[in-house]
Amino acid sequence: MKQKLLGMLLLGFASGLPYMLVFSTLSAWLRDVGISLTEIGFFSWLVLTYSLKFLWAPLVDRYSIPLFGRLGKRKGWILFCQFMILIALLGMSASDPIKSLQFLAIFAFLAAFFGSVQDIAIDALRIEIADNQDQGNLAASYQLGYRIAILVATSLALIFADQLDWRHVYQFMSILMIVGMLGVIISHEPINKEIAILRMDEALLLSFKDFFHRFGIWTAALLLLLISTYRLTDIVMGPMAMPFYLDMGFTKTEIGALVKTVALAASIAGFFVGGYLIKNLLLTTALLAGGAAVLVTNLFFALVANLDANLSLLSLIVGLDSFAAGLVGTINIAFLTSLVSKKYTAVQYAMLTSFMMLPGKFFSGFSGVIADYYVSISSLQTGWAYFFYTTSAMSIPALLLIMVYKNSHATHSS
């Protein structure tokens, strides 16, 4: 089991690194060189690939990558994607957002696309290498690796960016994909005898039908609606976090050295507490606690916006928000895993994560428009405060849906 946990830790790192480099850190790069909030918001649509991965998940179930597939179907896909991500990140490092924003966008899209395919294969591998009772530990290990990657791709990248050109920073980050390749090497891939090898249209249709058959039309529809609204607040707020810190007068080194370090420690605590809650509470109760925590901690950012730059206060609030994010991350992985049939592992998990991500990613594209609008009708500080009031309110529908589901279909985590 220890080798499985270590492998998932390294693969979690490989998942988190490209995602942050085409999302949060890219937002900081763009804002740092003077790109508008509106354009930065639209850039977040590049990572819609993570929300649409159910469309190409059947390929991961059906086909093996030539040469790479000798390692195993899942491991072959993961390693192939890691090589492609490395190349795409190098392409980003060769781009100049001021002279050719489109060129940067193309390579960012490629990194996001292959990052999403990598996630499909990693999720499938994680589900297949252990039974349900061990999924909480694997999810926590994956989240730990993911959060370490976030620290590296944000904190370390920001500190370097104060001393080096952003393009050199991305060159260095691309090399770190080797960590994920080590995770592939030490991971053992079992043979999944339950998997159904289907055409893409068959896989999507049958996995969808299987989900509704197992839960019933009413419960399945309720679950999909709950999943699609549960992460709205933090996903919509995400693209604007780095621009917000910079607009409030904090330096890249301050953000990287203190704020993001606190964020990692808090998120690690959050996902281990999430694992504890999964084992000791109803899964729906854990979902409710996580959703409420995200709503409250997001509101705290409005306090930062209304006060003068205070690094200690920002670190505290980022810590609380990161704790909530880690909590929700682990709980959400366990929740989605509990809904998946092993017959359609990759496709069904990708479908559910897509339902979780797609609404938030769609609205996050307008996050810069919203922030620019609020700033234009008030002041910089007041406008940002209004923005966080708006994102916090986005958690309310999910909390109501969880209570409806909890009252009628409460389930225990096993």
Predicted feature locations:
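Juxtamembrane intracellular "pre-TM" segments in multi-pass secondary transporters
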Residues: 1, 189-223
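Helix-loop boundary and gating motifs at the non-cytosolic
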Residues: 1-50, 221-226, 230-244, 248, ...
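Glycine-rich segments within core transmembrane alpha-helices of 12-TM secondary carriers
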Residues: 50-53, 136-161, 353-364
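Helix-to-loop junctions at the C-terminal end of transmembrane segments
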Residues: 53-70, 269-283, 371-375
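A membrane-interface helix-boundary motif in multi-pass transporters
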Residues: 71-76, 159-175, 369-397
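C-terminal ends and interior cores of transmembrane alpha-helices
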Residues: 77-98, 292-309
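Multi-pass alpha-helical transporter architecture, strongest
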Residues: 90-96, 179-188, 389-414
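C-terminal transmembrane helical hairpin of 12-TM major facilitator-type secondary transporters
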Residues: 285-335
